[in-house]
Structures are given as structure tokens and as C-alpha cells.
Amino acid sequence: MRKTIIFIILLFSAVSNGQENSLSDEQMNSSGANKVEFADGDEEIQKLAKLDIENQIPFLLLQGGIDQMISYKDQKFEEKFKIYFFNYGCIAPSEKVESIYNQVIFNYLFAKYGKSWIKEIRKDIPGFKEFKKSH
């Protein structure tokens, strides 16, 4: 019985420490991804994305809706390339706004990882098709 309890404690501590890729509420609330829908123009949207990169919390913005769930494959992508998917749900900024933000993040991924991430990324992210055409 004692061995079982020790095993359970060790298991829970390993699982809780394995969640490296989660953000605090403060990081989420202060992120550019959270503020992008209120940005005043393309340059401010790009600036918010660059700030998220500098703060080591780059996001890829997803159009909302039920079909935009973040899958296990997406979570593996997040871990591997050190980014976060941001799903607004049903009320999201325009696809144009998301595309402008995402273009900055795509360029960051390209500069840091080359083309390796392109094969693994989900293809429905706003702005991805345009980015892929130009690279």
C-alpha cells in the first residue's frame, strides 16, 4: 500500500511538472494576441506580434468556432516550435487582422527554424496560404 501511495505521488508530481508550455493568466491577458482586435491599424498589429516574440510568448491566431479545437498534434507543434495557438472562440477579430499578426509569427518561425515547421503546421491558420506562396 505504501509503495502504491508513493508511486501515485511521484506520478502526479511528474505530470504537473511536465506542463512547461502553459501560460499564466497575466501572460495571456497582457499578450498582443489578447489585444490585437483593438489595434489601430496594421503597424500596431505587427508591433503586438513582435512584442509577443520578444516576451517569448508568440501566438498563432485561429479563427473561432467549434471546428477550431486545439488538437494533440497542435500541442506537439506548440512544444516543438515554442509557440501557442490562440483560439478566440465564436467572437474573433477579422481574418485580415489575424493574418497580419500571424505573418509576423510565420516570419519568426521561418527565421528560427527554416522550412521544417511548414510541413507540420495546420493549414487553416489565417494568412498561412499567403505566407507559403511567398516562401
Language model regions located:
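Short beta-strand and adjacent turn/loop elements
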Residues: 20-135
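Bacterial Sec-dependent N-terminal signal peptides
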Residues: 1-23
